[in-house]
Amino acid sequence: MEMYETLGKVGEGSYGTVMKCKHKNTGQIVAIKIFYERPEQSVNKIAMREIKFLKQFHHENLVNLIEVFRQKKKIHLVFEFIDHTVLDELQHYCHGLESKRLRKYLFQILRAIDYLHSNNIIHRDIKPENILVSQSGITKLCDFGFARTLAAPGDIYTDYVATRWYRAPELVLKDTSYGKPVDIWALGCMIIEMATGNPYLPSSSDLDLLHKIVLKVGNLSPHLQNIFSKSPIFAGVVLPQVQHPKNARKKYPKLNGLLADIVHACLQIDPADRISSSDLLHHEYFTRDGFIEKFMPELKAKLLQEAKVNSLIKPKESSKENELRKDERKTVYTNTLLSSSVLGKEIEKEKKPKEIKVRVIKVKGGRGDISEPKKKEYEGGLGQQDANENVHPMSPDTKLVTIEPPNPINPSTNCNGLKENPHCGGSVTMPPINLTNSNLMAANLSSNLFHPSVRLTERAKKRRTSSQSIGQVMPNSRQEDPGPIQSQMEKGIFNERTGHSDQMANENKRKLNFSRSDRKEFHFPELPVTIQSKDTKGMEVKQIKMLKRESKKTESSKIPTLLNVDQNQEKQEGGDGHCEGKNLKRNRFFFW
């Protein structure tokens, strides 16, 4: 209620009050029905039933429910405000409504009733007070507190419904198997009142109403007479037998001829003999003079005009239009899902690392000659490696194993993705072990370092640890383009290491010739303390087994062990690896 300003009380009933309020933001006048707070469940049942029907069914001639909320344990229903009813019209026109106005009102009321009946809904409380009339002449059926769905065979309804004056004889006799005809009976009584200005069957009790029905309309049917005779309420009561004219216009002389026919068709004692709402809409009373064709455009224009004035109420779309829009939304949604799924699959394919192509190039020439490696083209066709490499002496049978990276690296960015060194990242040229020469060839130190995602050979996989692969550079290490001074220094380092590797290999041969008793106390030289010192223990056991197998086959073939020596170990070896004032972190390869 904070959003509404109370203007006054409109009405009050047995179940609650209706307040006239104004929306503070839009200024629209609304009617708020407030249900009483009572311990019994009947009030909540009626309120929830009305909410259910108003949310489920929408029609031009049904009152619009704007919102529902609960405050202080009271249910509040907010409706569009129409403070005028048919009863107010009858109080203004004491002798009844004029014929043109009456036909327009009745046509709209029948449209609302036919809409409910087509959805198997019975209103059960049709009367002049529940027919709202707007300033432009649009009628709307309201008060769905007693409305309910049509019962299945064998089900029963509430016995007390509808206002007494408009109650059908089956309701008066408390027949629980009633249906849609009760609304048609109430409509017939209301038509007479709207045409004459006086209620047709005013009564003070059910017995009084039943007596007037027999006098003005007709005698009870055999089924209703049986219920009447067995009812303890009417025990000892005898109803009169009256002969009524069969002609409708003689029976209702105060009514217009066609209107009298409609009333006669509505007020039939037997519910099965009453006319339906759809047949009433096609009655001659509405079809003559092209009334429907002329009035419908006028009605549509008035509805659109009211929809513009009422900011909180939007014009309802037809069910077919809603279905078409829902189908369009579903189609757009499914197309969006399909496109997104296809795009996701393509992205996943691009994310998968491509297979590494290993190209073996035979090198011809002498021991000190080696041909320049061919320029590699990445699969993306973007990057190429510089063909100028440092030359190291190799045997004529040596084969170069070229490992290409799975993804091309932009030369404008470094290994960490920073724009720095154009030579950072690329292919790595790694010579395999020469089995015919005891001197083991080291990898080209000036070539680019291993990429973390490069796939190594099977033997290299076995030697790799979980923390860092052999020959892999730490993420923060940098690689710069080697100069001529650096290449000369590296040649000296390489010659020094080859001699050191021969000495280490000879020591391994001697150690393998020990006796079994000595082997039990055999200790390998301790590895330098690195990040992977814990994991190299398991690697040493595998190397021992591998060396034993190779020693049985041939004593000339030895397998090197590559160790990653950190920067501190480099400094102890005499300052190797310094490059004209710049301290560079490099990978050292020990052979022993």
Curated annotation (Swiss-Prot):
Using the UniProt annotation, give all residue ranges assigned to the region (Disordered).
368-390, 459-485
Any GO CC annotation of this UniProt entry: nucleus
**Where along the chain is composition biased (Basic and acidic residues)?**
368-379
Where Phosphothreonine occurs, the residues are T158
* Chain intervals with Polar residues compositional bias: 466-477
The protein's UniProt keywords, in alphabetical order, are: ATP-binding, Cytoplasm, Kinase, Nucleotide-binding, Phosphoprotein, Serine/threonine-protein kinase, Transferase
The UniProt entry, under PROSITE patterns, shows:
PROTEIN_KINASE_ATP, PROTEIN_KINASE_DOM, PROTEIN_KINASE_ST
Q: Which InterPro entries match?
A: CDK, Kinase-like_dom_sf, Prot_kinase_dom, Protein_kinase_ATP_BS, Ser/Thr_kinase_AS
Modification type Phosphotyrosine: residues: Y160
Report the Pfam families cross-referenced here.
Pkinase
Catalytic activity as recorded in UniProt: L-seryl-[protein] + ATP = O-phospho-L-seryl-[protein] + ADP + H(+); L-threonyl-[protein] + ATP = O-phospho-L-threonyl-[protein] + ADP + H(+)
Annotated ranges, domain Protein kinase = 4-286
Q: Where does motif [NKR]KIAxRE map?
A: 44-50
Q: EC number(s) on record?
A: 2.7.11.22
Give the record's family classification: Belongs to the protein kinase superfamily. CMGC Ser/Thr protein kinase family. CDC2/CDKX subfamily.
The domain section of the record reads: The [NKR]KIAxRE motif seems to be a cyclin-binding region.
Q: What is this protein called?
A: Cyclin-dependent kinase-like 3
